[in-house]
Amino acid sequence: MMELGHCDTTKSFTGKGDFGETSIITGERMAKSAVRIEAIGSVDELNAFIGLCRSENAHKDLDDIFEKVQHKLFVVGAELAHKSEKREKKIEVKNEDISELEKHLNTHNENLDLLKNFILPHGNKLSAYLHASRTICRRAERRIVALSKMEKLNPELIRYLNRLSSLLFVLARTANNRDGIAEKKWKN
């Protein structure tokens, strides 16, 4: 289990962020607009949206995936909050985590029609929330790529988010498919 270090989680506010700065796990202060903070914030937003997906989900197999992903997103956030030279290597995204996402992708793709067109994000609430989560995941991935141009990061972070966004797309299609909702093709 990851330790929060200096963080006092008993207080709901400190007032230290009132002037546009925040602290990361190491205690280092930085601008809230810093690339690292943007990346951490996008991952946090994604985790919250996956929680929203869980609130609309009635399928145990999907909930198991969502919960594992939520736990892993905390790992992603922990990696981003530590500069790579200061990070414990036992708390990191690994190739096995990506393989697990790929396994779920393959399993859920088997029950879906082959796509030949773009489809509109729509359908039941779960599907709509999953599509929104997918776009947040893509943003988080872009923020992590930007940070990786500034410093060395675990390359599995980018791979994990890339695969996760694909899985969220497939699960959005799965949610509609299970409810018998037809996909709407994009028309130009």
Language-model segments: what does each one mean?
Residues 1-188:
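Phosphate/pyrophosphate-binding loop motifs in nucleotide- or prenyl diphosphate-using proteins
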